[in-house]
Design a protein with these regions (language model features):
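Short alpha-helical elements
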Residues: 1-204
Length: 204
């Protein structure tokens, strides 16, 4: 796992990946078993797996959640695996630990004055899409920019899930799961980098 993470970080330095201070943050569910078998899934329960909700699929699942910080070009710059019940805002705090000078675009799950102020104190700016009835909503033009840029996340997660089967858990333990997710993200970033070098589509 440490070797994979080292390779991933080296990739971000060696390949022509644009150096950016603008990022998109989001998360996706990582169910470790079918919902009905959750009580028998002891190997993962001992490593923090619990119940969480997936708003996009409108379902409850048992497992973890993968939080990702993604560049506007689509590279996964950082990721964190937490229990499924962990709030997205807490996941973001972990992701940007030790970082500063970032502008982060998020959806409604990242709205919160406490979080925004906490990130601002570290030199980061959080621009999260607010609810339509919010009294402090962003101007229409800004909302359109955030929404447009956030569409990159849908493409990234779609490729991770559809082409790399990132959401399909075959590991029997937490360490194996972490290694597998790290390998998938490394493979994704590598293919994206090769695409930019050869100006061709590299099959994931």
């Amino acid at each position: 796992l440490q070797t994979t993470e080292l390779l991933r970080r080296k990739l971000l330095c060696v390949f022509p990946i644009p150096d950016s201070r603008y990022f998109v943050v989001d998360s996706f569910p990582l169910a470790v078993c079918k919902f009905g078998r959750a009580r028998y899934c002891r190997s993962f329960r001992g490593y923090g797996a619990d119940y969480g909700k997936c708003p996009s699929k409108k379902e409850t699942y048992f497992g973890y959640k993968v939080h990702a910080l993604i560049t506007l070009e689509g590279y996964i710059a950082a990721f964190e695996i937490t229990a499924a019940s962990v709030d997205d805002r807490e996941g973001l705090r972990d992701l940007v630990e030790g970082m500063e000078g970032l502008v982060i675009l998020g959806d409604k799950g990242y709205v919160g004055e406490t979080l925004a102020q906490d990130l601002a104190s570290r030199g980061n700016c959080l621009m999260a899409l607010k609810r339509s009835n919010s009294k402090t909503n962003w101007p229409r033009e800004v909302r359109q920019v955030i929404f447009k840029r956030r569409r990159r996340v849908e493409t990234v997660f779609s490729q991770l899930s559809g082409q790399l089967n990132a959401e399909r858990v075959l590991a029997r333990g937490f360490q194996g799961l972490c290694t597998r997710i790290s390998n998938k993200i490394l493979a994704y970033n590598l293919c994206l980098a090769l695409n930019s070098i050869f100006h061709e589509t590299c099959e994931l």
